[in-house]
């Protein structure tokens, strides 16, 4: 779950 959030944050940033 956390990995999905981090991946999304990376894409946004």
Swiss-Prot record:
One of its GO terms (cellular component) is extracellular region. Its main location: secreted. The modification Leucine amide is found at residue 13. The keyword Secreted applies. Expressed by the skin glands. Belongs to the frog skin active peptide (FSAP) family. Temporin subfamily. Antibacterial peptide with activity against Gram-positive bacteria (MIC=6 uM against S.aureus). May also show activity against Gram-negative bacteria and fungi. Shows hemolytic activity on human erythrocytes (HC(50)=60 uM). This is Temporin-1SPb.
């Amino acid at each position: 779950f956390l990995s999905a959030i981090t991946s999304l944050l990376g894409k946004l940033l």
